Amino acid sequence: MTLAPPAARFGELTIHPDISRAIAELGFMAPTPVQTRAIPVLQAGRDLFAQAQTGTGKTAAFAIPILEKVDAVLKRPQALVVVPTRELALQVTREFGAIGKYRKSHEVAIYGGVPYGPQERALARGTQIVVGTPGRLLDHIEKGNLDLSGLFVVVLDEADRLLDMGFAPEVRRLLRRCPERRQTALFSATLVADVRDLAQRFSHDAVEVAIEPEKQNVDSIEQVYVEVLEQDKVRALEELLRRYETDQVLVFRHTKRGVDDLEEKLRKRKHNVAAIHGDMTQRERERTLERFREGDLHVLIATNVAARGLHIEDISHVVNYDLPEDAEVFTHRVGRTGRAGKTGVAVTFVGEWDFDQFDQLRAKAGVPFRREILELYDR
């Protein structure tokens, strides 16, 4: 298959007018590399195995071709997108809704931790696009609520995370339930052996696309470190919030208890702050994320796990309140800022016991850090 050269604008891709209108209203001007490469492959009906990092526009890369092919007259599932987390299910479903604004198809997010009833009713109405987590999808199949016999495409989004989280058996069961004659697309941040084996087993003559991580993840983020005693970290954070012109700030802590403790302290100091972690109900997390997404919150405090899949373009600053455990966690955290062509600042607190670990982290991360002196120590 001969691939077209990268498109400079969406107008250079062949996209249905209804979808072109929606993406123009969303402000999408130039397609990302993964969109340029993946959209023509999927439009041609080919299977796809794409290596692309989070934040590269991969959701639109598969949503656009799917929305073009879905038949809104047929009241049954035609496209299935399997994702590792509830937050990602909701995010992908929202993007389908936004891009498909002028199409007449319907999408539904299927995930655990909430009652079955609303999902059952949505499926009964004949939704065409189903986005969900493996366990709850299988539950609905077993209950007779979800029929996959009419699918023309299956997408495994963040396939490496699906396997890392132990969903391999459920994913295989789902794929065996799907029609043999179907299109299959896998998107993964890494080309680990397990993901490649899955792709080879359940796809046919797949086109392989590898997208290099965007340089903006490094170049557009200023890395700052601050030496601070553990007992002074709250005051240090307040000083940084005053010093920088911050839009929205994402603060990382290791533990749920640490998240709650910091939220309470900042709230008492009259900061517009909220927390998100795994002990909160799904509804509480969704409400908090929506407030942050809409700009109603200035500071969001989160654990690493709770912030996975968090994609908000206006996060101006990330603060590593607790030193990241390793370079991978560091990269994930700081990558929440400096997105969509914007610049960002990542501040890492280095406590009195953190110097050796920070030196190792800095060496592995391979990015320059600037030291900032706090006023509370510069007196």
Task: Locate the predicted segments by residue.
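Conserved helicase RecA-like core
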Residues: T2-R379
